[in-house]
UniProtKB/Swiss-Prot annotation:
It is an enzyme of class 7 (translocase). Belongs to the complex I subunit 1 family. The gene is mt:ND1. This is NADH-ubiquinone oxidoreductase chain 1. It catalyses: a ubiquinone + NADH + 5 H(+)(in) = a ubiquinol + NAD(+) + 4 H(+)(out). Core subunit of the mitochondrial membrane respiratory chain NADH dehydrogenase (Complex I) that is believed to belong to the minimal assembly required for catalysis. Complex I functions in the transfer of electrons from NADH to the respiratory chain. The immediate electron acceptor for the enzyme is believed to be ubiquinone. The keyword Translocase applies. GO terms for biological process: aerobic respiration. It is a multi-pass membrane protein. Coiled coil: none annotated.
Amino acid sequence: MEFILSLIGSLLLIICVLVSVAFLTLLERKVLGYIQIRKGPNKVGLMGIPQPFCDAIKLFTKEQTYPLLSNYLSYYISPIFSLFLSLFVWMCMPFFVKLYSFNLGGLFFLCCTSLGVYTVMVAGWSSNSNYALLGGLRAVAQTISYEVSLALILLSFVFLIGSYNMVYFFYYQIYVWFLIILFPMALVWLTISLAETNRTPFDFAEGESELVSGFNVEYSSGGFALIFMAEYASILFMSMLFCVIFLGCDVFNLLFYVKLTFISFIFIWARGTLPRFRYDKLMYLAWKCFLSFSLNYLLFFIGFKILLFSLL
């Protein structure tokens, strides 16, 4: 019975995430429209609300082609695996429904994000296109560079709260949010989240002027839709993780989802306003600035815990 309840909870979660992804794309198009002083999609149905569902139907009913001399199996499997990982990583979040409660939620998140690199790399390589391969290589180098700082910041919090379980963030933020105490850390985490999800200003994987569309250049119809959905699901997840770590983790509160929407809006806002970074500056930022920053914070938290234990 417990297994059936977990299965139903997982299915509900997946459906809710996919519907959220649909409306996040609509929000992005609306916000970008207003940033560029025009209307977003507003013709389909009431104020353009069914637009993302129409786009999904259009994409999945188009002809699925595959490039000549491409690696057929890995070419098709990588978008599916990419979406699967983006949905699977949601399991580590503390939810009210009967889901798997992980004591090692933070570690599970790191494993899933590390595996996400391979899907991009395989998608780029198996397309048999120079543009796709270069885009894939860029995305892999970028993700690996920023994952180091991401893991170190998460490890700092693990030392602070003494557990990998996400629920502990709620206990430690009852009186004051970590955002207020550790504001520089929150800014760095948000920047790393932008880089991890390959979003503006770090969208080198799909630099139009250089790589046409990056690692997904050869994908059409369903394959492209799956990659697109995986990207937006990871944006939502990163927004939720930011709210859990820095904004109180009160997941049973309606205000939590208002905060989640605001952080997702920041991702879109960055896309509408910021220009693309230079690639060497991106790598400089990752290895010279963020790595030293996260290592310093890690040492600070370890020292803080040692001091605390010595006083006790």
